[in-house]
């Protein structure tokens, strides 16, 4: 109830009204309302339709293009994501857009382009993680460890393993927020690096149970 009241005060329309107008009469909504409408659904197809409409009504606002890029990226369509991010950058090359273009470049193996984009992404909260991944790709493991800082992610642990900081890697893997098959796989690698055969066996078993494709590794 308080959230609804808040929306009335800030936007002037309830969530229900905004959702309805987004599909029936989007021209009644301003850019903030339209972008907000996309957050009221968890259906990527509906989000895409709303953001696409926003790009038509407000072509000079980069955010809808950027968000379409994120949706494409999450769906695994890297080329489509890149074209949306480039369109967003042509409207307004914000640090966030540069960050996203850097991630695309890194995925495509263009480390020089990734570094250039990340250089324009100062202030984004993901920069440390992204630079860490870039340094791993470049083989600069100590710099990668420094970039990740105290981040508790699989990528941070990988950097620590490659830099031979095994105690830190073990602590990182034990504190990953949402551990997955790759977390277990890295724990197995760590076990192999530290001659802990029982850790290798138990971690590999757990990893393969979550993702059978890891058995081939």
Please identify what each model-predicted range represents:
Residues 1-187, 191-217:
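N-terminal targeting segments with Sec-dependent signals, encompassing both cleavable signal peptides
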């Amino acid at each position: 109830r308080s959230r609804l009241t808040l929306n009335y005060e800030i936007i002037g329309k309830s969530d229900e009204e905004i959702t309805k107008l987004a599909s029936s009469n989007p021209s009644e909504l301003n850019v903030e309302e339209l972008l907000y409408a996309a957050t009221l659904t968890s259906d990527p197809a509906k989000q895409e339709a709303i953001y696409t409409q926003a790009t038509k009504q407000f072509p000079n606002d980069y955010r809808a293009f950027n968000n379409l890029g994120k949706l494409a990226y999450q769906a695994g369509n890297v080329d489509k994501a890149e074209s949306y991010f480039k369109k967003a950058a042509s409207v307004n090359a914000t640090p966030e857009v540069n960050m996203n273009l850097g991630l695309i470049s890194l995925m495509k193996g263009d480390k020089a382009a990734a570094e250039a984009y990340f250089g324009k992404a100062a202030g984004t909260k993901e920069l440390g993680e992204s630079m860490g991944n870039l340094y791993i790709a470049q083989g600069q493991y100590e710099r990668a460890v420094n970039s990740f800082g105290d981040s508790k992610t699989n990528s941070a642990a990988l950097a620590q393993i490659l830099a031979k900081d095994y105690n830190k890697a073990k602590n990182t893997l034990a504190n990953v927020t949402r551990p997955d098959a790759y977390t277990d796989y890295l724990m197995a690698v760590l076990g192999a690096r530290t001659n802990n055969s029982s850790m290798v066996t138990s971690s590999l078993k757990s990893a393969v149970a979550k993702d059978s494709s890891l058995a081939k590794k």
